[in-house]
A protein has these predicted regions:
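Beta-strand elements within well-structured catalytic alpha/beta cores of enzymes
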Residues: 23-35, 52, 78, 135, ...
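Non-catalytic, well-ordered alpha-helical segments in soluble enzyme domains
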Residues: 128-137, 340-377, 454-480
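A long, amphipathic alpha-helix that forms part
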Residues: 209-231, 244-285, 361-363, 465
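Substrate-binding rim/cap in mid-to-C-terminal beta-strand-loop elements of soluble/periplasmic
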Residues: 315-354, 427-469, 483-484
Length: 484
């Protein structure tokens, strides 16, 4: 009996020694359309961004290495450690089985918490695993994950495929909602939050600081009510600040409206760090801050100061190119759709009219290249035949998912603004530094203050978090850990 006891204790000790050290909580904070230079353009108060800059590890040269640089692809790439070519989220919208769908559209589900008859949403279009998924696999599904954002895709994609919940803002019902993919009824704490904050939620949350405040307030309630960071396994809380993007699209970078949201964001981060310190402890949580993409200054802002800029409006480009193709082939609508700097050929029209596909493709690319603002219109399937820089070819390839992405990718000249000249708002989506250079800061558990200017990538975020936690990288991950 004594010998058996000794053996059992030895096995227990061995298992304990093999158990890796992990934080109680991982907090992912993504600020939609936050340019890297915003870190240094604002006069931050105490406790928020200033704490991150002073106590965190900064990666000052973090790049998105694919196109298009848009919200859904960015959130998916951060949490999967890979790009649209592998995770399948080819844009905010893309073609799926011949239909234009949103990145998280799922007609097999329905909405919960607002108008329950609304179209459902889920992460099913995301075909690779995430940080949260890998945490659950590593802990036999004891880890818990929650996603919070105003935008549906910004809450759903980061939370992975098996979270406790994902909650986003529904304008129609002026409430935070979810879908039947996760549950059939809102948790009491979310319903109570909607009731308590009804007036604020019903306000212009997209363009006012209150949208940021509500996002963090709901995240704090998730932290408390789901007891995140209080269990035996590491949990994940994914927060995305969406109104920084929405307001910038309408009013432009560094507009007073956008500035006011960033000032409020600074205060909310300060408060949330205090909450985390009190509930979890600074040494028990790992936090990272990044962005899903950057943003291009508008045509009016650039030209007002004599800086080079131009505009190109994709809906007009679709109409103009189709007119050229109709004259050449005698068939209307040979280009079916455009989205995220890509154009889709109308395969049905080409086939039914017995047209030569390659001839239509060549003509379409030529038609789309006619405006001087466009440098290349690329047949992605034959991209290696184009005389464009290798680095740009690789970004196009890494953003292309066959069947979902458009067959033609548009490369505007550097500095070209996607929109109309009179629009004051910002935009994004291209390979340029303004759109692809993003902030990246790690702080908390096992992170020493410091910074680097070496090249890092958006895909390195998931690789770094998983490596620090000693869990398997997401199954499509192509990133490299930042820390040795």
């Amino acid at each position: 009996m004594k010998r058996i006891f000794v053996v059992v204790m030895a096995v227990v000790a061995l298992c304990a020694s093999a158990q890796p050290s992990r934080p109680k909580l991982v907090v992912g904070l993504v600020v939609d359309q936050m340019r890297w230079d915003y870190l240094y353009n604002y006069q931050w108060g105490e406790g928020g961004f200033k704490t991150l800059l002073q106590e965190g590890y900064l990666c000052n040269n973090t790049i998105i290495d694919y196109v298009p640089t848009v919200t859904a692809a960015g959130h998916a790439s951060i949490y999967t450690g890979t790009t649209p070519a592998f995770h399948g989220i080819a844009g905010n919208n893309f073609m799926l089985n011949g239909r234009n769908v949103t990145s998280v559209q799922d007609d097999s589900e329905r909405g919960v918490g607002g108008n329950d008859k609304t179209r459902g949403k889920s992460p099913r279009n995301l075909i690779t695993t995430t940080i949260a998924d890998q945490l659950q696999l590593a802990t036999n599904f004891k880890s818990r994950a929650v996603g919070i954002a105003l935008k549906d895709r910004a809450a759903i994609l980061p939370a992975g495929h098996h979270p406790v919940g994902a909650y986003w803002y529904d304008k129609g019902s002026a409430s935070f909602v979810t879908s039947t993919y996760y549950m059939n009824k809102l948790p009491r704490w979310v319903a109570d939050f909607n009731k308590k904050h009804h007036d604020e939620i019903a306000s212009d949350v997209y363009n006012l600081p209150v949208g940021t405040t509500l996002t963090f307030a709901l995240a704090e309630q998730a932290l408390i009510n789901e007891k995140l960071g209080q269990g035996e396994a590491t949990d994940l809380l994914a927060i995305s600040v969406s109104n920084t993007d929405m307001c910038s699209h309408y009013y432009g970078t560094h507009s007073p409206k956008v500035d006011s949201i960033y000032m409020q964001l600074d205060k909310e981060i300060a408060h949330f760090i205090e909450v985390l310190d009190q509930r979890i402890g600074r040494d028990n949580y790992l936090l990272f801050l990044s962005a899903d993409h950057g943003g291009t200054h508008s045509y009016p802002r650039m030209t007002e100061h004599g800086l080079p800029s131009a505009t190109w409006y994709h809906p007009d480009a679709l109409v103009a190119a189709n007119e050229v193709l109709e004259k050449q082939f005698g068939v209307k609508g040979l280009l079916k759709e455009q989205m995220e700097y890509t154009f889709y050929l109308n395969h049905e029209a080409i086939k039914s009219n017995r047209l030569d596909y390659d001839a239509v493709m060549r003509a379409a690319c030529q038609a789309l290249e006619l405006p001087e603002e466009i440098q290349w219109a690329v047949d992605v399937a034959n991209i290696d035949s184009y005389p464009i820089p290798t680095i740009l070819k690789e970004r196009i390839k890494l953003g292309y998912f066959p069947g979902r992405s458009g067959e033609i990718y548009i490369v505007p000249r550097t500095g070209v603004y996607a929109g109309k000249k009179e629009e004051a708002g910002s935009n994004h989506g291209t390979w340029s530094q303004s759109d692809s250079h993003i902030p990246l800061i790690f702080m908390g558990w096992h992170v020493n203050p410091g910074e680097t200017s070496r090249l890092t990538h958006m895909t390195d975020i998931a690789a770094t978090v998983c490596a620090m936690l000693h869990i398997q990288l997401p199954n499509g991950c192509i990133g490299t850990p930042v820390f040795e």
